């Protein structure tokens, strides 16, 4: 049990700290202050003292009340302090006393003023109901004193003490009936009511006695001490009797305090019953009961709130939230997690479970994002709306079509004379300007023959220019396949045939170099038949014309065959529509900016047109034809150089004229986004398997390159050729590839990434060279693609790890062993093969099994240290950190040589 402090006990007894300390001093309990701690025995002693005072005060008050009822005036209290006020009892009038004889009654008894015949104490009623037999016995022989008390007459001292002992002090006061009270109708009703009241009083007395007998325990004071808090008197309070007040019989209802009742187990139930029986009265509950009631109310309130909250939560949790998202393109991990209602960590965890290492800002392509969202419980809708990037190619009505010049592509193997043949047709010298006599990019020209135009496209024949050759085949109507009569069919010849067949382009074969003595056109025809090109004279449909670019023999026949093939194909186009065509080549001119060579296929391109070329937009500011002259319009099948683009387009992009610049900008922006998504999708993903492979194989070495070329096609060709050189050990990493001169920005990029700058047909400025020297960046300039490939191969070979090879130096047989102090075991050996060198690598072989691999620590010949011992000589050999050598072992000396590898 917890200790009690003085101020807590004073608060419980409702007295001041000073009065309590004085009282405890009179009782022999000395304390220093109100914070002093009291023992349990001291607390019980103080409570019993105050309880005796309250009991005496209650008895004195009962004397005063009885005297007041008789009209004798207040009784002096003789200095006894008042007991604390009990709960205020509502006024109830006592019924008029009966004389006991029915004959003396006038046939009606007096009713109480309130008109209620029920007993005031419900608690007593319940006791009476539980003990009907006892109540019946008591009803038969009720004493006269009890009847007198019930009639409102005062009790003498002996009777008062007996009433208190029987527990009747708690009976609520009864008032005299009013003088003007009405009589009850029927004497039997009045007698019945009086009889019931007597029975209840006798039952109450017996129940009180039983309770007093059963509650005689030591902790009685502690059990009802808290109840007495409400009943404790305030210090210095005077009673009305002491103040000289007199209370008449017809005044306010009396307040008779209850004496301390015996605390029983059913005390709270009795109090609840009493409070329920008197709805107008204030319950005289103890502090503990009030606290318990408050706790119960709070607990009920919390339970109701939790119950309501649980219902609300249950109502909220019932519909399962399913996120429905619409995906139109790539999306970052963080944005995807936000849209499907998950955290970024959950999405990353799922991706790692699928073997994809992702970060919070990494973008996922459309397919991956849709798969992740579906697996994480979201409903995914892929918006398949037609993107703005696609421009429909309008179908022209037949009446609007006009005949147009054919577009002819000259294709073939390198050095078979394509450019020379085209030069002979144009009667201009173009080959001399090409580096090494090799065409580096597509050239577009127009030739007039018999008042008709023919547009020629010259494609490179080198293997690195496959993409450019494929674009030339896609943009052409007729393909001229040039085959040298002395060389025959070569690899690029076969590739050109495949490109033309894939594009569905008719092929005209030009067998060139027939002027040479070793020329054999028949052999060429025979070889071409193996690839499905059968000459007309052999029953096929392929036109083959022998020509000579040097002597110009057969050139007119070749052009006539081209026009004949064009007539058969009926090439037509509508010149009165917005222009549409293909980008042949693009380059960056220092004075004019981005310049694109475009071939108009439909419509007419005019100055001021807004066009979109791939992911680039612009407004046509100027157009230059193949002769270098400015033109205002370009009809179908006309190649022109266009100025006014925002950036360099890719070779092979489709261009189309649109209504205004705003639409062109929107389309270009959308295409740039699509291009970025495709690059993201095509990029190699870092998976766990890749990480394990890299960890097992070691770090992959990279050769970083920055490529700058004169035209876009050359840069693409270099990129494709160099990327093919990558191996599992050395990778070519192209950091940047652009068109134009080498700039300081390129030097800064190369310096930061330790890259080499390769310039193809471009030259750096003086300040760029100086910046490269200061930064330690190497710039290599080339004009022929062969040299670039060879030099890059050599550089990659230098990055390869050298190959290690083991070289056996010699073998020695152990014939004796010696234990040398501080040196361990030394083997006496005889060199049987080669030589044994000091500090060489060695292994000990015992019965064909290697038992040690290490290094020779010492080598001696007699007592002298030697560098090596040749075959046929004896020596002493000491091995490093190995002493378990035995006779008969073989010591094998060897070394490791590194051999440089090549690609």
Swiss-Prot record:
Residue ranges annotated for the tr-type G domain, each copy included? 403-572
Which residues lie within the region annotated Disordered? 66-296
The residue ranges flagged as biased composition, category Basic and acidic residues, are 121-132, 204-231, 263-276, 285-296
Subcellular location field = Cytoplasm
Q: Where is this region: G4?
A: 512-515
For GTP, which residues are the binding ones?
412-419, 458-462, 512-515
GO cellular component assignments: cytosol
Which residue stretches does the UniProt record annotate as biased composition, category Basic residues? Answer: 246-255
Q: What keywords tag this UniProt record?
A: Cytoplasm, GTP-binding, Initiation factor, Nucleotide-binding, Protein biosynthesis
* Region named G1: 412-419
> Which region ranges are annotated with the description G3?
458-461
- Classify the source by domain of life: Bacteria
Coiled-coil ranges per UniProt? none
Q: Which PANTHER family match?
A: TR-TYPE G DOMAIN-CONTAINING PROTEIN, TRANSLATION INITIATION FACTOR IF-2-RELATED
Q: What does this protein do?
A: One of the essential components for the initiation of protein synthesis. Protects formylmethionyl-tRNA from spontaneous hydrolysis and promotes its binding to the 30S ribosomal subunits. Also involved in the hydrolysis of GTP during the formation of the 70S ribosomal complex.
**Any idea what this protein is called?**
Translation initiation factor IF-2
Native source species? Moorella thermoacetica (strain ATCC 39073 / JCM 9320)
């Amino acid at each position: 049990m917890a200790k009690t402090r003085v101020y807590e006990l004073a608060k419980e007894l409702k007295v001041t700290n000073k009065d309590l300390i004085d009282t405890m001093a009179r009782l022999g309990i000395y304390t220093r202050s109100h914070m002093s701690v009291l023992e349990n025995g001291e607390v019980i002693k103080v409570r019993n003292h105050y309880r005796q005072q309250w009991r005496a005060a209650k008895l004195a008050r009962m004397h005063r009340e009885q005297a007041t009822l008789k009209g004798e005036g207040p009784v002096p209290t003789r200095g006894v302090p008042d007991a604390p006020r009990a709960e205020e009892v509502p006024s109830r009038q006592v019924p008029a006393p009966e004389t006991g004889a029915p004959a003396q009654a006038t046939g009606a008894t007096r009713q109480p003023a309130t008109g209620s015949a029920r007993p005031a104490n419900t608690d007593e009623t319940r006791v009476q109901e539980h003990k009907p037999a006892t109540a019946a016995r008591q009803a038969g022989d009720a004493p006269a004193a009890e009847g007198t008390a019930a009639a409102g007459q005062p009790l003498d001292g002996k009777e008062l003490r007996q009433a208190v002992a029987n527990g009747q002090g708690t009976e609520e006061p009864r008032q005299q009936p009013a003088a003007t009270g009405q009589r009850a109708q029927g004497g039997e009703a009045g007698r019945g009511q009086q009889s019931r009241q007597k029975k209840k009083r006798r039952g109450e007395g017996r129940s009180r006695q039983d309770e007093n007998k059963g509650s005689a325990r030591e902790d009685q004071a502690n059990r009802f001490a808290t109840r007495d808090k409400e009943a404790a008197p305030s210090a210095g309070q005077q009673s009305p009797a002491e103040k000289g007040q007199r209370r008449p019989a017809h005044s306010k209802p009396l307040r008779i305090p209850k004496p301390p009742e015996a605390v029983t187990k059913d005390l709270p139930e009795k109090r609840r019953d009493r409070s329920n029986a008197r709805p107008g009265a204030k319950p005289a509950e103890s502090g503990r009961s009030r606290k318990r009631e408050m706790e119960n109310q709070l607990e009920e309130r919390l339970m109701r709130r939790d119950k309501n909250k649980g219902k609300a939560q249950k109502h909220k949790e019932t519909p399962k939230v399913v996120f429905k998202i619409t995906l139109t393109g790539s999306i970052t991990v963080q944005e995807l997690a936000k849209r499907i209602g998950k955290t970024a960590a959950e999405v990353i965890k799922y991706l790692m479970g699928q073997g994809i290492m992702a970060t919070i800002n990494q973008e996922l392509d459309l397919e991956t994002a849709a798969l992740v969202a579906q697996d994480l419980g979201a409903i995914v809708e892929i918006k398949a709306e037609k993107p703005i990037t696609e421009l429909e190619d309008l179908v022209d009505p037949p009446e609007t079509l006009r005949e147009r010049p054919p577009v002819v592509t000259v294709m073939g193997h390198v050095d078979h004379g394509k450019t020379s043949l085209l030069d002979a047709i144009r009667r201009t010298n173009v080959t001399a300007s090409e580096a090494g006599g090799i065409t580096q990019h597509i050239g577009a020209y127009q030739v007039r023959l018999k008042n008709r135009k023919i547009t020629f496209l010259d494609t490179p024949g080198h293997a690195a220019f496959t993409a450019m050759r494929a674009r030339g085949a896609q943009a052409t109507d007729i393909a001229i396949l040039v085959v040298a009569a002395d060389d025959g069919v070569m690899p690029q010849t076969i590739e050109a045939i495949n490109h033309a067949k894939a594009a569905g382009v008719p092929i005209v074969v030009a067998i060139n170099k027939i002027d040479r003595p070793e020329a054999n056109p028949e052999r060429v025809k025979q070889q071409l038949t193996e690839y499905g090109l059968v000459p007309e004279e052999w029953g096929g449909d392929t036109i083959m014309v022998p020509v000579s670019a040097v002597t110009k023999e057969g050139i007119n026949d070749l052009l006539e065959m081209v026009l004949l093939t064009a007539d058969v194909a009926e090439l037509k186009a509508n010149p009165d529509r917005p222009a549409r065509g293909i980008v042949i080549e693009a380059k960056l001119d220092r004075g004019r900016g981005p310049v694109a060579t475009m071939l108009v296929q439909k419509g007419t391109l005019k100055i001021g047109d807004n066009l979109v070329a791939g992911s680039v937009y612009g407004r046509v500011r100027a157009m230059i034809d193949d002769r270098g002259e400015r033109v205002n319009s370009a009809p179908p099948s006309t190649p022109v150089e266009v100025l006014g683009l925002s950036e360099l387009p890719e070779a092979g992009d489709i261009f189309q004229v649109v209504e205004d610049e705003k639409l062109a900008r929107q389309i270009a922006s959308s295409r740039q986004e699509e291009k970025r998504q495709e690059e993201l999708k095509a990029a190699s993903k870092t998976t766990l398997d890749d990480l394990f492979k890299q960890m097992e194989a070691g770090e992959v070495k990279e050769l970083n390159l920055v490529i700058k070329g004169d035209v876009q096609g050359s840069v693409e060709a270099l990129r494709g050729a160099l990327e093919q050189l990558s191996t599992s050990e050395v990778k070519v990493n192209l950091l940047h590839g652009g068109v134009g001169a080498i700039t300081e920005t390129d030097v800064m990029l190369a310096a930061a990434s330790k890259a080499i700058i390769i310039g193809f047909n471009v030259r750096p400025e003086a300040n760029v060279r100086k910046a490269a020297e200061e930064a330690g960046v190497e710039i290599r300039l080339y004009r022929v693609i062969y040299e670039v490939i060879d030099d890059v191969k050599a550089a990659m070979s230098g990055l390869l790890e050298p190959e290690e090879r083991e070289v056996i130096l010699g073998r020695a047989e152990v014939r004796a062993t010696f234990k040398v102090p501080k040196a361990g075991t030394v083997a006496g050996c005889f060199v049987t093969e080669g030589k044994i060198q000091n500090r060489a690598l060695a292994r000990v072989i015992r019965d064909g099994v290697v038992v040690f691999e290490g290094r020779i620590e010492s080598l001696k010949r007699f007592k002298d240290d030697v560098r090596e011992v040749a075959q046929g000589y004896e020596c002493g050999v000491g091995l490093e950190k190995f002493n378990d050598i035995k006779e008969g072992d073989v010591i094998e000396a060897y070394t490791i040589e590194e051999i440089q590898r090549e690609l």
